[in-house]
């Protein structure tokens, strides 16, 4: 378990060598799934003060779906639409790197602190995107940081649009009137 938290911390510190390590370690998939689940739980509980109990399960589910859409579309766009000449990637290895890049999202749990929710959400989001750029650059063997950043940000925005739509539908169905963010 100690190795798990060290890896998550290294991802949050933007340690590029971590992504090589995670790509090579096929046994890290369980750890990667736990990182993403903890991210989803942090989002859910970090927004609890604004969404209540009705929001917890929905927030976890929507966050996990949003993360998957972000990671998978980034993989498809990076490998199929805009590869560099050296780009080769294994889908599972790529998903592991993107999972660890979501570790800064654990900070969203601090959204429970009154008045900090919005700032924490924005700060953690930016940090996650930067970590994902490092992960994408390593996982897809990109030489260009700009290419990795452009693909990561565009796919992240697509994921945000999907998540926003899902939140609107879910919270409308359960009568949650406050924004979770």
Regions found by a protein language model. Give the residues of each.
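Loop-to-transmembrane-helix entry motif
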Residues: 22-29, 97-102, 143
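Selected alpha-helical membrane-embedding segments in polytopic membrane proteins
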Residues: 1-89
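Juxtamembrane boundary at the C-terminal end of a transmembrane helix
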Residues: 161-181
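Selective recognition of hydrophobic, aromatic-rich stretches within alpha-helical transmembrane segments
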Residues: 54-77, 92, 101-161
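Membrane-interface alpha-helices at helix entry/exit sites of multi-pass transporters
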Residues: 29-33, 90-96, 147-150
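Short helix-capping/hinge motifs at transmembrane helix termini and TM-loop junctions
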Residues: 50-51, 82-83, 112-116, 141, ...
């Amino acid at each position: 378990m100690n190795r798990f938290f060290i890896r998550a911390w290294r991802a949050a510190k933007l340690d590029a060598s971590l992504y090589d390590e995670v790509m090579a370690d096929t046994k890290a998939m369980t750890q990667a799934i736990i990182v993403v689940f903890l991210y989803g739980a942090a989002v859910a509980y970090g927004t609890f003060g604004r969404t209540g109990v009705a929001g917890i399960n929905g927030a976890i589910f929507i966050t996990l779906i949003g993360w998957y859409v972000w990671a998978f579309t980034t993989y498809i766009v990076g490998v199929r639409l805009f590869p560099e000449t050296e780009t080769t990637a294994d889908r599972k290895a790529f998903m592991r790197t993107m999972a660890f890049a979501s570790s800064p999202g654990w900070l969203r749990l601090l959204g429970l602190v009154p008045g900090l929710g919005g700032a924490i959400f924005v700060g953690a989001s930016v940090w996650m995107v930067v970590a994902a750029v490092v992960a994408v650059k390593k996982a897809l063997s990109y030489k260009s940081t700009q290419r990795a950043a452009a693909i990561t940000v565009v796919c992240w925005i697509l994921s945000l649009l999907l998540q926003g739509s899902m939140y609107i539908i879910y919270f409308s169905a359960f009568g949650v009137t406050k924004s979770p963010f």
